[in-house]
Amino acid sequence: MKEQEYFNVADIFGENVFNDSVMRERLPKKTYQKMKEVISQGRELDPETADVVAHEMKEWAIEKGATHYTHWFQPLTGVTAEKHDSFITAPMSNGKVLMSFSGKELIKGEPDASSFPSGGLRATFEARGYTAWDCTSPAFVRQDAAGATLCIPTAFCSYTGEALDQKTPLLRSMEAVSKQSVRLLRLFGNTTSQRVMPSVGAEQEYFIVDRAKYLQRKDLVYTGRTLFGAMPPKGQEMDDHYFGAIRERIAAYMRDVNIELWKLGVSSKTQHNEVAPAQHELAPIYAEANVAVDHNQLIMETLKKVAGRNGLQCLLHEKPFAGVNGSGKHNNWSLVTDDGINLLEPGKTPHDNIQFLLVLACILRAVDEHADLLRESAADVGNDHRLGANEAPPAIISVYLGEQLQDVLTQLIDTGAATHSISGAKLETGVKTLPDFMKDATDRNRTSQFAFTGNKFEFRMVGSQDSVGEPNIVLNTIVAEAFADVCDILEKAEDFDLAVHDLIKQLVTDHQRIVFNGNGYSDAWVEEAERRGLPNIKSMVEAIPALTTDKSIALFERFGVFTKAELESRAEVEYELYAKEINIEAKTMIDIAGKQIIPAVIKYATELGTSINTIKAACDANVSVQTELLVEVSDLLADTKVALAKLQEVVAEGLTMEENESRAKFYHDEVFKAMEELRAPVDTLEMLVDKEAWPMPSYGDLIFEV
């Protein structure tokens, strides 16, 4: 074991980030002040300032060892993209080169827009696209085996201005919710807050397996999840992995991840074992939404990159292993002013906090009226495997408020006024040496998709490998709409106090159906939700149409977040993505079954038959056990061959379909079903065939031997 290196986190935190302290130190005072205004007040960046910033950024990056820069952006592929350009200029007459980086190169790039998903917005011959510097998310230097690269967070749009990424609409939605939040604050006499920013913290779950074993599983390599696999004798039923002692190999990996992230200014805070064997979680401290989205991408990239260095493999798929919990990403969301006021802070007496109650009522309205959009924002091929099982919230959107706030709302609905708030009692353990302390006013509900957790909402439906961009785009926009509508009413009110009380009561009464504080895993809740008229959208394919309803188009166009064309293009991209992912999984199953499993089982059955004949020839022994096993294996082998032929047939049919939506529905209804039918006999065979004869590592090998 290598000797442990000790250090002070404060000494390395943000050392590879061109942050405010670096700008204050390196930029001329006038330039620094202009940049502060651009970042904090949303002012335009003039070319002269951009040139000065670019020069200092380049000099700083070169000191860090950087030879190249890249516009780091997030297209609709779900992962980041980048093109690297070196700082060198054309050689001079003496053969030497200079290192140069201009303001124009800083603020604008030109990747090929036709090579990324666009849903028809860009044809192959319409290649021009632009990346634009998001100066509110700091540039950073990424150091790895390939060297050091200056990474500039950017937005990505087409030549005609349509958004082709996650960041552009996210920034638009942030402006929308800020503007409407400030309107609401002004109604309550706040004249100091100038901006309100969504604050986001994304908890990241993941699996870690041994890389050598991972490389022996084509399904993991090609799709990120196991397409075959029988459960080992032990799974997660003992509840001994969650918060258990972290194994030394994993702890060393986590340490390396933290060091990388801290240097990049990502405030990695919490790490622990999750419920399933080999499953873990990393959680950062909150940041402004666009920075938090960038940081989550950095977290996922770093988890994968550092795993490889440690002989490990990080699995970010929502359901890499059947039979144990999958992975999600809890999106913690609140609204905070530029002078530090959290709009979701209820205070000690929330019944008296009228501003908070109005904000809460607006959020209930937003979630109730746009539950389909919120569900769509978490729609993902992998997420279809975990939503609705006893490991993740069901696909029905509801809001958990807890005992304290539910009691306040009940008072408002029943009497028109709330006069008291339930307080947290003292927790007494009965052990004198343990301190007594005040409990929170409400418990936590881990089965809720959208839960109030003290001073924020936690959206727990997001998939582990997805960007948190889309969920926050939707949250920001639907809340902006609710704020705008109540401001339209209250700004015209003759008696504000009376009007705001009446409006809060009306909103919580009209939208109380969205509140559910019980067990979201129960069948009874599914039935109750249906009685309440709440949508139960069970799959990604069923969720996508929410993007292009008249209501959704009107919502996003009203606040300038998406155009109709942009929404239609995203729906097309998602249909296409769904069909492609299932197609890759199906072809991988065909490949594994045909080239590995069937040959291995035939060989095993042949050896079994030879063994039976050898024993019979040697003596009159009882070979009924071997014979029964051979018959069972042979029957399952025949079932496997039939199921394989069926899967090949439906995949071929799916490939003939040209229209994205119909193809996606076919893959959901027919291809996925055929995949399940192939898996069933294969998983049974794995439990019968000699382990030495089975052609790939088992679940037990993967999740317990790391």
Describe each PLM feature range.
Residues I12-A127:
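Active-site core of metal-dependent hydrolases
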